[in-house]
């Protein structure tokens, strides 16, 4: 019996990726459009530094929600977003009201990131790629709007609301789908009680199963952080591109969608390509144009995230019957993203 692919579920998981990215997009809009320097005002500091800090805080937060009532959260998010953009456009207390609305909405939008991971990552692995692809598509769309200065027009925030709406429709389809229900059943032990309906590994059990991958992820992070510090200090590749560099800091959420073949060998291949791009930037600053150096920087980041994606895939395979695997993967992604973001931001300020 051959496996069939549900194309409606593919579209739904792709849309769910749009919804999951809403918190990152929200932070991106304020950090790039409403902020010109991370140390200019306290509002700018808030917009730029909120993403790594909130990601670190979210690791320690437990979220339990009734999926059928999340429509109220959607209305709240859209209402706050609309009020924020209107306040900014009409210059209504933008120094106090807008930052306050930003924080409230950012924290509540993080709930979508958590619940979307929890639902989609219990479905078969093929749907993970479309979820991550939707996440990446949302970030790319907003990046293009910024690149072509469409944010200066009257429709500058339309994509945010569109992604939220279609994302919620897709999310509602996914959590009601049989694939999600079967995914939860896969995590049930043969014998279970009321208190232990699902297999839930402890932190020590996870460390025992996925220790090698976690060590590799840590060493890749250290290498990438050291590389970014070196490039900030000894090259000008990051000069003037902080607006667009922001998106490279959250690649652990979505770059796995572009990987065709994932293995330890491919982890090594991606790492070598990333290292090569780093040395080309560092040593060939006078041989390449500004655009070419920016392209090499993009290659360096994407290959790094692809190497991480291969390792995260191996962790998911090893822990496929663990009910908390989706949240564990999300926590690892948030930790890696936040530490890299903090490293780059501090390096830019200290040079």
From Swiss-Prot:
Membrane protein topology class: Multi-pass membrane protein
GO CC list: host cell membrane; membrane
Principal subcellular localization: host cell
Keywords assigned: Host membrane, Membrane, Transmembrane, Transmembrane helix
The keyword Transmembrane belongs to this UniProt entry's keyword annotation: yes
Membrane spanning stretches: 14-34, 43-63, 70-90, 97-117, 133-153, 155-175, 214-234, 240-260, 268-288, 293-313, 328-348
Keyword Calcium on entry: no
Localization, UniProt: Host membrane
Family to which this protein belongs: Belongs to the herpesviridae BMRF2 family.
Protein name: Gene 58 protein
Species whose genome carries this gene: Alcelaphine herpesvirus 1 (strain C500) (AlHV-1)
